[in-house]
Amino acid sequence: MANVTVTFTITEFCLHTGISEEELNEIVGLGVVEPREIQETTWVFDDHAAIVVQRAVRLRHELALDWPGIAVALTLMDDIAHLKQENRLLRQRLSRFVAHP
């Protein structure tokens, strides 16, 4: 099964996510997303970056956060997701050694 990755130019990315080029420059500078490729004169973004930016835009509208606040919130949300996954895996490993009533 082949993986397909959709890529966007800056203009396509901004149209797809609803952000301006200035906002895109700011969130790239904050590390919210990174270009998949840096071509000679432009950036190219993948579909994962579009999902992250759409999530960021939702946070901006729902919580009225600025872009630096959104960068922190997304980092914390990702950390929580990783910790939950690690906790789930550790519980599964522990359950092998603990007798269930």
Swiss-Prot record:
This is Chaperone modulatory protein CbpM. Belongs to the CbpM family. Induction: In late stationary phase. It comes from the Bacteria. It comes from Escherichia coli (strain K12). Interacts with CbpA and inhibits both the DnaJ-like co-chaperone activity and the DNA binding activity of CbpA. Together with CbpA, modulates the activity of the DnaK chaperone system. Does not inhibit the co-chaperone activity of DnaJ. HAMAP family: CbpM. InterPro entries: CbpM. GO terms for molecular function: enzyme inhibitor activity. Gene3D superfamilies: 1.10.1660.10.
